[in-house]
């Protein structure tokens, strides 16, 4: 069986630093003494906690309960982690005020949820002649969201027929 920790008779060293079930140091003892102490406190296992220490550190505990607690804390930590996503909102150079406000509210929601926001301004046809209008839209978005975000990548040159800017939420 492949376990992260060796237990009981799997421990193949002469001496171990023993910690009893109360978490108190019992000192350095032979492996036989440790197994006998474990037998006295029936239903408990001798678990190798730190195999690389000199001598290895072993603890008397209920191994099943130990594994359960370990997996429970790992699940809790995994729950707390948040995967940052990049949400995209597309504008046009001629986006009207009402649409602009709706899209701005969406951007605020994305940033408050901890996601990054990618703002794209797409140019069609003759709009390419007025790229400055599109860049003004990006500048306006940047200024409106300055309190809750930082610019991660500023709009430089156009990528094909679109200008792109990425905003990240400010650290609290």
UniProtKB/Swiss-Prot annotation:
A GO molecular function held by the record: translation initiation factor activity
Domain of life: Bacteria
Gene3D superfamilies (UniProt xref): Translation initiation factor 3 (IF-3), C-terminal domain, Translation initiation factor 3 (IF-3), N-terminal domain
Keyword Cytoplasm included in the entry's annotation: yes
Keywords carried by this UniProt record: Cytoplasm, Initiation factor, Protein biosynthesis
Keyword Cytoplasm part of the UniProt annotation: yes
One GO process term, biological-process aspect: ribosome disassembly
Site keyed Important for 30S binding: positions: 100, 103
Subunit structure: Monomer.
Protein name in the entry: Translation initiation factor IF-3
Organism per entry: Haemophilus influenzae (strain ATCC 51907 / DSM 11121 / KW20 / Rd)
Taxonomic lineage: Bacteria, Pseudomonadati, Pseudomonadota, Gammaproteobacteria, Pasteurellales
């Amino acid at each position: 069986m492949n376990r992260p920790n060796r237990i009981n008779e799997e421990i193949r060293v002469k001496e171990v630093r023993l910690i009893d079930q109360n978490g108190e140091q019992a000192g350095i003892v032979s492996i036989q003494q440790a197994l006998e102490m474990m037998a006295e406190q029936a239903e408990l296992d001798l678990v190798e906690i730190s195999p690389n220490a000199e001598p290895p550190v072993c603890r008397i505990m209920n191994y099943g309960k130990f594994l359960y607690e370990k997996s429970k804390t790992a699940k809790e930590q995994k729950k707390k982690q948040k995967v940052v996503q990049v949400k995209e909102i597309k504008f046009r150079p001629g986006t009207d005020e009402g649409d602009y406000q709706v899209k701005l509210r969406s951007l605020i929601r994305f940033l408050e949820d901890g996601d990054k926001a990618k703002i794209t301004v797409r140019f069609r046809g003759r709009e390419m002649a007025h790229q400055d209008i599109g860049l003004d839209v990006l500048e306006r978005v940047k200024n409106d969201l300055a309190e809750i975000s930082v610019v991660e990548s500023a709009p430089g040159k156009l990528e094909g027929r679109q200008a792109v800017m990425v905003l990240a939420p400010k650290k609290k």
